[in-house]
């Protein structure tokens, strides 16, 4: 986090960065998330996603979710506006998700770039109040076939 903050500051000295050199846990997540209006997820595990989801619900904050696995990605916006669908609606059985085997090693470099760009677009739509936010919907992409879909939750 600190190295990333230093590199970003070198690119743009006008931005304000608050790096957290600690893992997000039940002990610190509530206070960290409380400082922000929108939460954007870039984590790589189910436990952290459930934690972020539950705190965003408690604090009534939109949660912009993105996940990748190899050549596949998905994005959604939870707990936004009148749409109260959340991560637990997408994956209701937390224990089952924790038992899943780890994904295969390696991610195609453009997969996180595409998913992150879609997440950033959703944040801009929320902030600026334009377009249809992915609230209550899940957008998926498979980069092997370039097929994308949007599903209602």
Per-region residue spans from a language model:
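Adenine nucleotide-associated cytosolic modules
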Residues: 1-153
């Amino acid at each position: 986090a600190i190295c990333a903050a230093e590199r970003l500051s070198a690119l743009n000295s006008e931005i304000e960065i608050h790096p957290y050199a600690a893992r997000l846990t039940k002990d610190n997540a509530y206070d960290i998330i409380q400082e922000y209006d929108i939460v954007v997820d870039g984590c790589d595990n189910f436990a952290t996603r459930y934690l972020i989801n539950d705190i965003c619900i408690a604090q009534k904050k939109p949660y912009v979710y993105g996940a990748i696995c190899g050549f596949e990605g998905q994005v959604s916006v939870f707990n936004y506006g009148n749409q109260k669908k959340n991560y637990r609606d997408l994956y209701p059985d937390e224990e089952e998700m924790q038992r899943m085997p780890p994904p295969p090693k390696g991610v195609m470099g453009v997969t996180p770039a595409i998913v992150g760009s879609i997440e950033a677009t959703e944040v801009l739509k929320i902030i600026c109040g334009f377009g249809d936010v992915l609230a209550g919907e899940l957008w998926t992409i498979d980069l092997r076939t370039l097929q994308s879909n949007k599903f209602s939750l």
